């Protein structure tokens, strides 16, 4: 069954050594799948320069509800 998760991601800018926090909404079957989905999204966004960061860290995955 699919579930809705909030995934908090910390973005790091290596040039200014600052960080910021974003929250992504993800539909997945479990926490591991949610983590994998966000990791793939972040890698692609960094590669295509869509994300305003040099690196990231997934810091929290929060289950919201079953769909």
PLM feature segments, named:
Residues 1-19:
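Short aromatic-glycine-(Arg/Gly/Cys) micro-motifs in beta-strand/loop hairpins
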Residues 11-13, 27, 41-46:
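Sparse, context-dependent recognition of short Cys/His-centered cofactor- or disulfide-binding micro-motifs
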Residues 18-31:
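A short, exposed loop/beta-hairpin motif centered on an aromatic-Gly-Thr core
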Residues 13-15, 32, 52, 67:
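Compositionally biased, intrinsically disordered low-complexity regions
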Residues 1-2, 28-34:
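A short, structured loop/turn motif at beta-sheet edges
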Residues 5-11, 26, 55, 60-64:
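Short beta-strand element of the conserved SAM-dependent methyltransferase core
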Residues 40-67:
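Short, mixed-charge low-complexity intrinsically disordered segments
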